[in-house]
């Protein structure tokens, strides 16, 4: 047998395996990895292994993100959409209440009288207990016990009705609304909130002013029911959301309820006087649930806002039979508003941009304002720059919205009759006590000597207005007429062009010459039509 021929194997025997080739030979024998245009592929099995690991990690990350998203949605639905509450006024609610508390059952023990400040579901509107249903007669409880059970709910109010009185101070920026709001913030019988819709505008920025009106109304609807958890929906990113406290609410550092006992020992609610925000910021933060409990103790709830542009936006709230809402429309000479906006233009630049975005692009504009806004080389800090342009441009939207509101008020629908009051800032600073009494009578509050003295002190001080966002005692005459020396005649005519309709209704006379503007002995106030 030749040496080159293979040796025959016995029957049933397996051939002996050949020795393994070196790794370099194996790689050389492998076919080249397929390549596609525009796509890189691993050049070796080791690269393929790394590629597969990266793909697995990426898929696992996407799966984890999907799971976390679903858990977040379930957590939101669990906390923000509780079980449907049974309507106590409906047939089913009455039946459940009778079965649970024994009302109306023969031989059952009488129900205990409700506590004056018991915690209730924040989404349930304030409803006083009906006479004869689960309530102990006053004769049985005694007059002293009945008065003690009411507590602060009826103190200092006119009439003593059972329904909670709700008030919305409807105004715009730089109209003296901070001072006007203090007339309610300082009242011991009032729960006051300072511009809560600010949270909506900040969260939904850069939405224009008109598109945010519905969200603003929804927030007010919740707040008037003492559902303060609505602040969590619009809390800033990274602020904790569900862990938001009282000090995270806009304007809380000067709120008398937040800074007074029992929430904070720094002040006493019954003592009239401005709150120092530096002191209030040191108060311990309180949970919103605790703030809600304080809200339900007050029979009068007042919200001041500048971000609702038309009273018709509030129509659903005014029509709601569960809410006894009244609107106080605080107005000011639009020329004074424009002057104050220019002076504080950099502090309001964000809001001015949101308002300017709501302008009608078909509206006529006077050429000098457009030139001022796009002036080449204009400095941000100088007059005639972009900040001035937005400050004056916002007046167009503000005055158009004011004209719609005043037109509605001149021919009020049923939902507005008896629920609307116009207050001019010039009348407030000219005769603060008379205006205070008129406002308090409208909302059913009693005027105390301390509040009268507070109003007088705030309008007869000598403080400077160099800080436009700080409430302080100032000279009323200087504050009302400052625009006549601060604005140019062209700026005055621009504002009058935008605002001639509301000016005519509210009794603000237009000027014809620069000399007439500078003549401070001549009043430009006339009797308003409202």
UniProtKB/Swiss-Prot annotation:
Residue ranges of region Disordered? 1-20, 97-128
Recorded catalytic reaction(s): these are:
3-O-{N-acetyl-beta-D-glucosaminyl-(1->3)-beta-D-galactosyl-(1->3)-N-acetyl-alpha-D-galactosaminyl}-L-threonyl-[protein] + 3'-phosphoadenylyl sulfate = 3-O-{6-O-sulfo-N-acetyl-beta-D-glucosaminyl-(1->3)-beta-D-galactosyl-(1->3)-N-acetyl-alpha-D-galactosaminyl}-L-threonyl-[protein] + adenosine 3',5'-bisphosphate + H(+); 3-O-{N-acetyl-beta-D-glucosaminyl-(1->3)-beta-D-galactosyl-(1->3)-N-acetyl-alpha-D-galactosaminyl}-L-seryl-[protein] + 3'-phosphoadenylyl sulfate = 3-O-{6-O-sulfo-N-acetyl-beta-D-glucosaminyl-(1->3)-beta-D-galactosyl-(1->3)-N-acetyl-alpha-D-galactosaminyl}-L-seryl-[protein] + adenosine 3',5'-bisphosphate + H(+); a 3-O-{beta-D-galactosyl-(1->3)-[N-acetyl-beta-D-glucosaminyl-(1->6)]-N-acetyl-alpha-D-galactosaminyl}-L-threonyl-[protein] + 3'-phosphoadenylyl sulfate = 3-O-{beta-D-galactosyl-(1->3)-[6-O-sulfo-N-acetyl-beta-D-glucosaminyl-(1->6)]-N-acetyl-alpha-D-galactosaminyl}-L-threonyl-[protein] + adenosine 3',5'-bisphosphate + H(+); 3-O-{beta-D-galactosyl-(1->3)-[N-acetyl-beta-D-glucosaminyl-(1->6)]-N-acetyl-alpha-D-galactosaminyl}-L-seryl-[protein] + 3'-phosphoadenylyl sulfate = 3-O-{beta-D-galactosyl-(1->3)-[6-O-sulfo-N-acetyl-beta-D-glucosaminyl-(1->6)]-N-acetyl-alpha-D-galactosaminyl}-L-seryl-[protein] + adenosine 3',5'-bisphosphate + H(+)
The record's GO CC annotations read: cytosol; Golgi membrane; nucleoplasm; trans-Golgi network
Localization terms from the record: Golgi apparatus, trans-Golgi network membrane
- How does the entry describe its membrane topology? Single-pass type II membrane protein
Tissues where this protein is expressed:
In brain, it is expressed in pyramidal cells in the CA3 subregion of the hippocampus, cerebellar nucleus and Purkinje cells. Expressed in peripheral lymph nodes.
What Pfam families does this protein map onto? Answer: Sulfotransfer_1
- According to the UniProt entry, which residue ranges have a biased composition of type Pro residues? 8-20
Positions annotated to bind 3'-phosphoadenylyl sulfate:
173-179, 332-340
What follows loss of this gene?
Answer: Mice are impaired in the elaboration of sialyl 6-sulfo Lewis X in HEV. Lymphocyte homing to peripheral lymph nodes, mesenteric lymph nodes, and Peyer patches are significantly reduced. Simultaneous knockdown of CHST4 and CHST2 results in lower contact hypersensitivity response when compared to wild-type littermates.
Q: Name one GO biological process term.
A: N-acetylglucosamine metabolic process
Q: In which pathway does it act?
A: Protein modification; carbohydrate sulfation
Listed name of the protein: Carbohydrate sulfotransferase 2
